[in-house]
Amino acid sequence: MAVLAALVCSSVAAADKPVNPIFVLNSLDASISVIDPVSFTELRRIPTGKEPHHLYLTPDEKSLIVANALSDSLTLIDPKTGEVQRTITKIIDPYHLRFSPDMKWFVTAANRLDHIDIYRWQPDDPITPMKLAGRVHAARTPSHLSIDSKSTTIYASMQDSDELMAIDLLTQKPRWKISIGKLPADVYLTPDDRLLLVGLTGDEYVEVYDVSQAVPKLIKRIQTGAGAHAFRSRGDGRHVFVSNRVANTISMIDIQTLSVVETYPAPGGPDCIDVLADGKTLLVSSRWARKLSIIDIDKKQVVRQVGVGRSPHGVWTLDHASRR
């Protein structure tokens, strides 16, 4: 029995061990740093279009899409090897991006040009895999996006007009738009689609809205730290991390109690976050330090920093916790 238990533990440990590369987007270098997930060393850099900011996995999980804002293009790479698969052009000013859960729609925020584009996802079309279906003119600087689990609603923050917008995905028209706190950035929708968390980069808290009704309602402001910015689920259905770029910290929020339960140091202007499958290791792009910071949640400290390119932004790995 002892031998069997040891084998089971060994198998579990092996399953939890990351095997796929970590990708960090270097926004000012037009490249992607490929990081070894075990040694945490940079293996190589992949060239992209100008200003790659965010990245997202295709519904079939065969491609990781990198949005190149200033090149009006998308770079598709293999999430397991980092090999470039293809480039899609004529995608106007893609800053942030999301796929709908029903795998029908691909949405981008045109940060510089003040609109949100909705594309029909056609993966079997080798010429036009994405066909523009609608364009919603936003206020000033649409920033981050989230889509509900039913694929009916897009939520978008307007960074420079301090607004939050909901868009009907089927009609491609706004449902509502409200004024919120200063410099809203990332938006995180809870798994039940009821609450929307908004990071306020111009303040030091996260605003929480009940979006389950026709009219959204502000129900709480969660004090996190100056420059509340980007979210990432821990993968346990209860906790979400938020980066506080000015405070140089990461806060862990309990989405049931809507309170901060832990805070971690994160030097260098923490921006985007990913969580390894163990649920205990954070990967954080340190925007101002040209580093990828590795944070051990149990130790509550940065245990490693990896040098990357200029202005590191999006960070992602196939071995992240929310896939469990």
List each model region and its residues:
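Bacterial N-terminal signal peptides
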Residues: 1-10
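Predominantly soluble domains enriched in secretory-pathway, periplasmic, or organellar proteins
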Residues: 11-324
